[in-house]
Amino acid sequence: MKKGKLLTLLPLMAMTLAGCNLNQKSSFSFDENKVFNIGVCQIVAHPALDKATEGFKKAVEEGLGKDKVVFDVQEAAGEPATCATICNSFVSKKVDLIMANATPALQAAANSTLEIPILGTSVTEYGVALSIENFSGTVGGNISGTSDLAPLDKQADMVKEFVPNAKNVGLLFCSAEANSLYQVNTVEACLQAQNITTKRISFTDSNDLSTVLSGNIAGLDALYIPTDNVCAQNTSIIDSICRPEKLPIICGEESLCAGCGIATLSIDYFALGVKTGEMALEILKEGKDISKMPIGYDTNPTKKFNKAICQELNITVPDGYVEIVVE
């Protein structure tokens, strides 16, 4: 969506909701007979995002009862414009809550309504996603949710853990994903602080990924890929280019690592979905004011490694890493 439009909407969201007092807990009364309708917009079918949706549904069903909630789960096949269509349809149906899975879904939802509560998940950085300057951890208005951001400084440290002599590291990301750039900026600074030379390798979409990556890996000792939806959808392409060159890849999340990486410090997307579902229950069942709900995080990311690729690249796995189970 257009950042300018979103920047205009966000202050209006706060003022509109503050004026209407939509979530005043003092006047809230839970109707045990009500059947809630929840719209779920997911940018694309992907193992990590799928787990987040599953966790969300499980938590809500357990909290409300399966017979008291109806989910309308729709996927946008990777198209932000389709997210907008989906979210607008949810607004027309007057759903009780929208769960937006991934940044494009959140942006579309934010642009579709100022009244219906919106919970994001699998969103790396809400300040970046919603163009909020000096983001303090609470969006305000009708938006909150959970973040899939893992400690980026610790991900950067993994490069030296697995490739001790690394001096030149590439940073692969899709230029269309603002959250990817945020991660790259942070990791790059951490690597440079360790006297590692970095090289940004950005591509526009899946059509130019192969050409861009192939033309930029010469001389690299390792590659870092952030949590990036386009990269996650194209791990087979990345693997087919990097593995023959014996180029180890540190990844931002588990499913990406399972497809092409050697190691990751990854959050649990199912648990993240559960946390998002618990936030939904606080809103729907307890009348909690979403405008005051801070963004939630998985505070226990796990160090994981891809056994097959580590063995093929003859890489020694440090203690404390758990093998990724490839489904």
Where do the model's predicted regions map?
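Beta-alpha junction/loop-to-helix N-cap segments that form part of ligand/metal-binding clefts
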Residues: 72-134, 228-243, 247-252
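Pocket-lining segment of extracytoplasmic ligand-binding domains
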Residues: 178-247, 253
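Flexible loop/turn connectors
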Residues: 256-308
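C-terminal motif of bacterial Sec signal peptides marking the signal peptidase cleavage site
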Residues: 16-19
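Hydrophobic alpha-helical segments within soluble ligand-binding/sensing domains
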Residues: 30-31, 126-168, 267-288
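An alpha-beta-alpha
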Residues: 38-40, 56, 144-191, 289, ...
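Extracytoplasmic "Venus flytrap"
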Residues: 32-57, 63, 72-82, 228-230, ...
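Bacterial signal peptide processing site
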Residues: 21-23
